Amino acid sequence: MAPLTILVTSTTAQSVVILGGGPAGLAAAYRLTHLGYRVTIVDQRPLFGGARISEDLRDTLEPFTILGCHHATQALLHSLHSHSQQPAEAEIPLEFRLHDGSLVHFPRTSFPAPLHTWTNLLRFSGIPWKERWRLASWVEQLWEGDERLPADLEQRTADEWLASIGQSEQTRCVVWNPLARWLTGNDLSTMSADAFVTSMRPLFLSTRSDSRISVVQDSFQTCFVQPITETLTQVGATIWRNTDATQLRYERDCISGVLLRDGSLLQADWYVTALPPQQLTPLLPERWLTRYAYFEQLAELLSGDSTILHVHAEQPCATPRLILLNDTSFHSVLATAATPDRTGFSLITTDSQFAQDQPDSNLDIALSELLRSLGLLRPESRIASTRRRTIPGAILSLRPGTKLHRPIQRSPIANLLVAGSWTDTGWPPNLESAIVSGNRCADAIALR
């Protein structure tokens, strides 16, 4: 047997090994380097960012949305770019497609909180007037303390609970389910009512600035991954791509090293796993899985892939738009200007049939029909290109009971932290949750 190669990450300062180069791992690495730690980040993919891709996306535009309530995401974005080089953002309204094919905007008023929430709800024509008034009255009673949320929301589905407060099947289908799918990737019929309320509250029941929806014209790679990677390189962090971790070694309930596929052992003072739960559990010692409920409950977490179809059409885009959909496999469509004479459409789905990256003329036809029905694709325009990007494990199932199984960042192992959008952050599993979890891991290390 070949001798075991031991790689020690630092001898002059406390060191941290981070497994996973997705948003959570990158956020933790960036924060830790600013706190003076020596960081080694390991990822099994050729590119950081967490996508299942082989091409280099650094020069590819992939617009994405950021909500005003995503404070950690906004703070990281501003930290990575000087004031003059901040990525271009444009505020956009939220649109819904009704059963008759018409589109309605969710209104935004300039009233202070919480009056703006109540006024916006009453003005929203996507919900029948009687249901609007009933819901607005109920929300007002919550504010005044005359009504309380039920204690069993985590044990009930969102669909059942919304029906119990007077929201009709049609309203749930055209308004609440599209919102739930856009914010969490989950359907009302499968997610818990608590997860639904948690995802809605920051955007609709907070300040007016928190309800702002902005589209960033660039890509996540350009806005986050590239500048973080450049910063890590400049401060001397060690970056290992295309590298598999196979086991976490331990001594006396502390991590003693990470065994890599090539047989070498990576050692540090601290360890942060920023991996999906299904990739984390195979690395753990068997005795931990049976001894600690913290690790045992990871098996209860179920996740699925998310696929984004990037479609370019030969027509200009006057203004960006975001439309939430129903009665289709696609959750939403975001329209932005790819170039002055080209429009880019980003369609999100969790349907696995769209994850296969192969030519499909039927798909192009279906996409053209969908975009034309929304008034986004002109009759004389055609689709010039279609590209897919699949993010594995991006959607965590928020079925009833899941909240109890999402772990906090501090594990029962003294020098092991756990990061990821799927951990317990108070957010649904999204970019904000990933960044918050990475920040918390870094802060937990700094405070010990």
Which role fits each region the language model picked out?
Residues T73-Q74, H78, S84-A193:
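Mobile amphipathic helical/loop "lid" adjacent to a hydrophobic cofactor/ligand pocket
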Residues A2, L35, I92, T243-D360, ...:
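Mid-domain catalytic core of redox enzymes
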Residues F48-G68, G145:
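Glycine-rich active-site loop/strand segments that organize a redox cofactor
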